[in-house]
């Protein structure tokens, strides 16, 4: 997936940063949502600049790891609002020493809103439901767009694998519980749009992902 449109909502994917994070941009005629902006590549930066005239511009973070949040300080300075689960606030843009050589910068920012389990975000015909899925990090979440059957799963669930649970704040048992939770809420034809790698329908993931086998 690079770009698709359903009804009046356009969905675009940008692969950004040395760790190749999937950043998703949802736009309508008068609004924009960025999910996990990562560290901006030139293509993403140009696209974002073209949206500065929109009245509603929101960043939604699936979790607080630096590779998913690095573009946030610049975006917030330019009028975007950012949202994150409160359990990941302390992670925001804090770069572990092992990754500093890749060009990541430690640039924490304080301007954000927080959201919790069951939160619903409605803007410009887009309706996203938040599911708290800790395990990769304490505040990891997924955003579900039920009308168009999109699920933005961050680093909780990939097409053929799952996120790491050995990072600070991660927990393997909690992650497995979160995966069971997703199995109970995602419809088979939902397109899973993860934080890294390719996209796949959930019914395909149930067949090929060894971590979701009963």
How would you name each of these model-derived features?
Residues 14-16, 110-113, 132-134:
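Short Gly/Pro-enriched turn/cap motifs at secondary-structure boundaries
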Residues 39-45, 49-122, 210-211:
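Active-site HxH/HxHxD metal-binding segment of metal-dependent hydrolases
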Residues 32, 98, 127-214:
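Metallo-beta-lactamase
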Residues 2-51, 142-154:
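Conserved beta-strand hairpin/beta-sheet module of binuclear metal-dependent hydrolase folds
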Residues 10-12, 81, 113, 127-129, ...:
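Conserved beta-strand segments of alpha/beta enzyme cores
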Residues 5-10, 99-103, 124-128:
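Short Pro/Gly-enriched beta-strand edge/turn motifs at strand-loop
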């Amino acid at each position: 997936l690079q770009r698709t449109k359903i009804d009046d909502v356009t969905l675009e994917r940008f692969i950004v940063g040395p760790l190749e994070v999937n950043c998703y941009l949802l736009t309508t005629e008068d609004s924009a949502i960025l999910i996990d902006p990562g560290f901006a590549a030139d293509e993403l930066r140009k696209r974002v600049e073209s949206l500065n005239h929109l009245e509603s511009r929101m960043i939604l973070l699936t979790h607080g790891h630096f590779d998913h949040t690095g573009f946030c300080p610049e975006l917030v300075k330019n009028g975007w609002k950012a949202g994150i689960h409160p359990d990941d606030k302390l992670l925001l843009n804090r770069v572990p020493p092992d990754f500093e050589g890749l060009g990541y910068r430690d640039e924490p920012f304080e301007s954000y809103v927080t959201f919790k389990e069951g939160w619903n975000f409605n803007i410009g015909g887009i309706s996203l439901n938040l599911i708290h899925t800790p395990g990769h990090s304490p505040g990891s979440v997924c955003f579900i767009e039920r009308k168009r059957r999109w699920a933005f799963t961050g680093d909780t669930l990939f097409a053929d694998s799952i996120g790491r649970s050995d990072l600070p704040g991660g927990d393997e048992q909690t992650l497995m519980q979160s995966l069971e939770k997703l199995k109970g809420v995602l419809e088979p034809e939902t397109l899973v749009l993860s934080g890294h790698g390719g996209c796949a329908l959930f019914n395909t993931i149930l067949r090929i992902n060894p971590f979701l086998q009963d």
